[in-house]
Amino acid sequence: MDDDRPVWAKRITAEREARKWNKPQFIEALRAHSDTPLPGKASLLRRVHSWESGESRPDDFYRPLIAKTFGTVTAAIWPVAGSRESDAELVAGAGMDTLEILTRLRSSSVDAAVIEGLRITVNRLCSEYPHMPAEQLLLEGRAWLRRITTMLDRHLSLAHHRELLSLAGWLAALVGCVEYDATNRPAAEATRQAALSLGEDSGDTEIIGWAQEMRAWFSITRGDYRGVLAAAEAGHAAAPHSRAAVQLYAQMAKAWARIGDRRQVEVALDQGRALLEQLPYPDNLDHHFAVDPAKWDFYSMDCYRILGHGQDAASTENKLAESYAQNVIQTGTDAAGVERSPMRNAEARVTLGVIAVREGELEKAVEFGERALQGQRQSLPSLAMVSRELGTAITEHYGSDSSASEYLHHLRQLQSSAR
C-alpha cells in the first residue's frame, strides 16, 4: 500500500492486522459493535478498502464505530485540532500580566478580574506539566499555592471564597503530582490529601476525583493493586462522569493486568473508553488534568504489554502493545521532532523494548531502553516501574549478556533514584 496514506488509514490497517483479522472478519466485528444494521458484505468490503487505502475518510457514523471496534475513542484515531495555551493568555484573558496580579493580590481588594487572572495562572501551570523542569514547576506551583491560601483569610464573598478553594485544590493536585514524579513520596501524599480536603471544602467533585486518581497512581507504582481498585471505587463514587473517572478506569485496567485478570482488563478499558467518548474534546491538550483522548492508546499499550508476557511474540497482545506504543510516540511528537509528551513517549519506548526482547532482538531492546532513560522531564516512579519490566525481560531471555550490561547498570541507577 502507498506509504503516503493518511495516518488514520495506516492505523485502521495496523489495528486490523494486529488482531489477525482479514477484511471480512473486520466487517463482522463492525457488525457486532454496531447498534444499527450495516450494509451488505460487498458494500462494506468496498468501504474498508477505500478507508485503508486512504481514498475516502469514514463519515460521522463509521468513525466512532471503527474506534469502538478497536477499543479506543474516535479522537485517538482522528485527532481534533486542540489549543496549546501560551503565557500570552494570562494577559489576553484577564487583562493583567503576572506583575499586576501580584500587585493586586497584596491589596485588600479581590474582584472578579483577580480571580480570573488566578484561574488562568493555575491553568498555565497545569499546562506546563509535560515540559517544565520539575524543580521549577514545584517552585512556581508552591509559590502560587501559598499566595492563594493566604488570600483565604481575607473577607471574601462566598462565591470568591469557594473559587479560591477550588483553585488551591487544583494547584495542590498539580504540586502533588510533581512531588511524586521527583520521588518525594511523603510530601506528595500530604499534598494529595490537602487537594482532597480542598476539593471537599469547595464542593469541586472533579478535584476529589483527581485526588483519588493520584492515590491510584501512587498505589500502582508501589505494587498495591488492591489499593488501586479501592481508590477507583472512591473516585467513581465522587465524580462518576468526570475526566478523573476516565483515568481511574485506566488505572483499574493496569492493575487488573498486573493481577492477571484478562476479563477485568477488558471491562475496565471498555468502561473508560465509553465514558471518554462521551466527554467533550479538551480545550487545552497540554493541561495535565484534561485527559487527551490520545492518552487512551497509552493506557491500552501498558495493559497489552503486560498481557503479552509469556505469549508468542506475534500474539495479538504483543502486536497491539507495539502498535499502541508507535501511536503514542507519533502523537506525542510534533512535525519538528519536538516531544510534546516526553513522559508518555519514554514509557512507549520501554514497551517497544519489551516487544523487541520477545522478538529476540536484544540490541534493539537496549537501544529503546536507553532512549527511554534520557528524557529531561521524567516521572521516576512510573518510569522505574515499566523499565523494571524491560530489565527483567532482558535478564530472563539473555541472562548476563555483556551487550546489555551497561543498560542494566543504568537501570539499577534509576531504581536507586526512584526509591
Regions found by a protein language model. Give the residues of each.
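Conserved binding/catalytic microenvironments
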Residues: 1-4, 106-115, 119-419
